[in-house]
């Protein structure tokens, strides 16, 4: 099957949809056809809202934002009349011995960044605290990505200050945090409805297999979920997909785009709801615990549900538990919850319902922090444009997706005008 468009965007996450919105708002695109493809059956990308047990909205993907750190995202929420609620997990009320000393240790090490800030965070902390102490200190922050050799001490301080649970460690308590009252999927639906009303056509459930130049445009080969093959010709092309997806295409990524190196981290989120909110007996409502066991970060949302959130090795650990069977997975959660709370396992009931999500490439980022990286890329020969939060200083956040989309659409509008 063959069809064509003037403009094609591959990727219907927040970046791709925002690109479409910017383009359709411009007089330069008036009268031009626009087609959006995505491998998923629903738009949204890493925004994945879901109802848990028919009672509470949860986020299997992106789950929070800060107006101070993410002003463009806040503006989008307001523009599409999306209601926000306070994200309560911004303080560690219950701290381990190491966590009690964490803020002081980080403050004492901060002046050393000028001299050794380019070292890996583990190497940097080990230099002054010793290896064993450094490992314990970094583990107490709950984000195992901080152990990566690509994460410099300078980057680590920035990361810590931009995550709600541990922002106070670097004196960033003033940052407010919010979630969407009924899920960020509402924002996605709002943007999608706007671009659809403006004439964009969606083809969801199609995976991009390859792309090549074809005269003054591009020829895309795609495959549907049912194996149906599709050939699409377009004059202008934006790939609103992450680096891990770019690397699987025949577009010479990243060599012909930026020359930078990219990496990714797996993420795992598990949500559970119970007949009774048993954690209220321990005064844990709206509290987060960072623990030294495979659960890593445990969040107790009011009297509604609890969830845990892990990255790196522990994300893969939980994926393995799920693969071995649901009963074993739930028993592992129960065991580690009891250990974290210092209670016997029998005090923790079986959940009424649960849901989980493993993201093989949950966070993607540029591994070369010392280069001046554009927020959207253009292929040096073919001119294909690419956008992703991974190309911005807000990698892993929805804000980065919006910034990259803005730059990608600017590049294309500039090209159309010429």
Curated annotation (Swiss-Prot):
Gene3D superfamilies: FAD/NAD(P)-binding domain. Keywords: Antibiotic biosynthesis, FAD, Flavoprotein, Magnesium, Metal-binding, Oxidoreductase. One of its GO terms (molecular function) is oxidoreductase activity. FAD binds at residues 15, 38, 46, 64, 208, 398. Changing residue 397 to Y: Retains 60% of wild-type activity. Belongs to the flavin monoamine oxidase family. PANTHER family: PROTOPORPHYRINOGEN OXIDASE. This is Flavin-dependent L-tryptophan oxidase VioA. It comes from Chromobacterium violaceum (strain ATCC 12472 / DSM 30191 / JCM 1249 / CCUG 213 / NBRC 12614 / NCIMB 9131 / NCTC 9757 / MK).
